[in-house]
Amino acid sequence: MDRNPSPPSSDDESAPEGDCIGDTIYSKHWFFSTLTRLIEAVSEDKSQEGQEDEAPGDLDEELEDEICKVWDMSMNEEVALFLQGFNAPEILLGVIAKSKCSRLTEMCVGILGNMSCFLEPCMAISTHQSLGEVLLLLLSDADPPTLLETSRLFLTCLSQADVAGTWVERFRKDPSVRENLCFIMSSSTNVDLLVKVGELLDRLFDMDEDLMLAWIRSDCAPRETSAVTENEDRAAPLEMVSCLLEAAKQLRSESPEGLEIYMHVLQLLTTADTGIQAIVQSPDGGEQTWDFLLDLTCNDLCQPNDPPLIVQEQKGILSSVLAVMSAMFVWRAEQGHKVEKSLPLISSLAQVLENLEECRKKCPESDAREGPDARHDNSHLQILKDVSCEFLSNILSELSKDSVLQGISLGHITERRCQCALRNLLPLYSTSVGTFLAAVGEADRSLADTLRRETPVRAEQT
């Protein structure tokens, strides 16, 4: 079954007076009988364990259809409250614990996820200790739809401020949560699941920096050169950063929205020194991460033939990618990495800044029609500009005569791009601009004179 069937309409059957749930058309008796059938079916499967009459995982088609209806109806608040009053969390816990059918487990978790959209049922689900433990165990399940619904349930609960802390503490105390999420990111090809896991990590890391640091700290631990034990074989490669990168690669062509989520997770890591260390101190020194972000920036985002307004659409992912690369670049420069590998970024960053200038011309802040949404967009565009300028200033300050000559020969350093850089970097980054103009003067005196002549006031300090 590819999708859940719609709930029965009011014409399907006439419920006795007083049998309806609140103001809905849904029958209490129907729910009672459906949940009773569910309990009986699971109990019967349990009693027949070891017999070969039925293949494991089979579910009666009619019962599946009925449970799907419960799943759909549970999005209604009155139904969710009724299910809570009927002790549905306890019932569904028993079903999940006994079920050998992945589809049934998926549906039960989906019902709980829908109920969690409402505060009172969410609190009942979140404070149920045994249910919480079982749900955490489901992250090791091999069934992608079950994993998707489990991740959705966690994400929904984290959006409820009254119970979010309960779940964060559960995640913190159970090391298997981190390992299972890393395993999903590193091995799954299910786009919806990867996106949902990314959303879950994004919410968790944004809510609790201590949890984020705890989960990435092992990435920074010294690597043992001795042989690992059999139990360590699986855990050894599951580093948070490499798993995030693997998921991002999977989503690059499949889900731009999902890719943006993972880039924001990486950006969250760079807000702490431990996070930056986890990125740059991976076994390859962060080369895979750098190469992926470099290729993404130079070949996918904000291309020369794109309309300037593309930055409106890409402002989120651009801000995250450039922020991560900027943090990595500083470390790479300190470690003596050659700046020549970063020359294509001058073209990309200049393109971003030029497009931002065009956007400001077409959408001036003084526009009287500007509303909250426009102000929100403008603030994000300003963030993108700030990130781009800081990154570009870092690159320009590291250029030597030889690297400038190479940049000119490859077409990355042109008069137009240099003028764009000076317009945006001065006066805040005057020191970096001065260092850059000195290198340009050694490589191409004519270009340096032109740049100083066209920006005399701003370049005075240089």
Curated annotation (Swiss-Prot):
Subcellular location: Nucleus
Principal localisation: nucleus
Keywords from the named record: Nucleus
Matching SUPFAM superfamilies: ARM repeat
Location of region: Disordered: 1-21
Domain of life: Eukaryota
Matches recorded under InterPro entries: ARM-type_fold, Synovial_Prolif_Regulator
One Gene Ontology term, aspect cellular component: nucleus
Family that this chain belongs to: Belongs to the SAAL1 family.
Protein's job: Plays a role in promoting cell proliferation in response to pro-inflammatory stimuli.
PANTHER family: PROTEIN SAAL1, SERUM AMYLOID A
Designated name of the protein: Protein saal1
Gene designation: saal1
